[in-house]
Amino acid sequence: MNKYHISLELPKILLTLSEMTSCEEARLAALSLQPSGDFFEVQKRLSETEAAHILIAKFGAPSFGGLINVNNQLSRASSGGTLSMRELLDISCDLRVIRGITEWRSKSAGMDTAIDDLFNSLYTNKYLEDKINNAVLSDTEMSDNASPALKDIRRHKRLEESKIRDKLDGMIRSPKYKSSLQDAIITQRNGRFVVPVKAEHRSEVSGMVHDTSGSGATVFIEPAVVIEANNRIKVLESRERDEIERILSELSEEAGSFADTIKISCESAAELNLIFSKAQLAYKMKATMPIINSRGVIELKKARHPLLDPKKAVPIDVSLGDKYDSLVITGPNTGGKTVSIKTIGLLTLMAECGLFIPANENSSIAVFKNVFADIGEEQSIEQSLSTFSAHMTTIVNISNSVDESSLVLIDELGAGTDPVEGAALAVAVLEDLRRKGAKIAATTHYSELKEYALRTN
């Protein structure tokens, strides 16, 4: 992130935006969002946010919950790989979310919006969604109805298990084995049905020992009368695994055949999620859509710093770039000077990200290719004062980079040195920046700088 954007606290706004998203792709996109210095790109971004803002007002927000990045899974499937049950369910979940978004959009049929292209890139696939859901019940469970063969295998398996239980039930109820059994229960060891036998009565129960208790007092025996039935179950379980693998392969092949449209749909849905999150942030901040221009003009009406309590923040009116290109803000310490220039800078960056701004309607924001800031920290919201040396290093770096498409914000210009020298230095810096065509907002407590501002256009 640009260090000037950090000093203006844009990352905090983007963090708040990211917390309003529903999917990881949109969250990461929010956190990495960069202001654009291109007028038409900013116009496009704001138009998209406006479209979502209007749709939310009329129909409420669509749900993006459950959207997952399945690009890797789809790539594997389209290359012939077999997906797990969890991976197939993730694809089905995305298809459900996409279907839900398109159904929500149908409420506004006939409305033309700036985000129609994204909505039109959502491809529903109820066929694949249902096919996966009808076959896969959970991460580890395949439905009996996934295929006729699987249903038949499991039916035979249940019959064999029932026969074994009947035989073992008869055995544990028989007086013949009452004294031999540790408990009158049927359990399993190594996937085979066994009964718990007292170790000292081991010879009284014919069968195969599969396990011994920790104390050695109990042995778990598979009685001879059920060995063949247990063997048949093992064969059926092997066939069951093979059939499940075949079904997973078939479903994966189906998913792979639709990989391209699903990827496009998921990408469009994630982008829509970000746009609607911008609109929801606007509602949260009671923000409005700024009027943007490429003339370097900023006209803010009752603007508020978005990170301050709106009940306590003092709104400001700002005019810069129309009648004059430099704005010098004066006043005592703790008078709100730093917050004022931070507000100018942050709202500019927000607009360039496609975000509405906390200001009255018809406020104007210019699109700048670069926004530079040297924020002194006496009035900083959270950080400490930088040294004069660091302050001047930043000023020099800014001076070397500015042009007529730049906005420069400087807090306590010339502070940290002798007042007379500091005032002279401040005037020289402003003259240099003005000569290069930059729009400037600076704060100061030097009376000389106030006088300079009054006699300068």
Task: Enumerate the language-model features and the residues they cover.
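Extended, Lys/Arg-enriched charged tracts that mediate electrostatic binding to polyanionic substrates
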Residues: 151-201
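Extended, charged coiled-coil "arm/hinge" scaffolds of SMC/Rad50-like chromosome-maintenance ATPases
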Residues: 124-141, 228-249
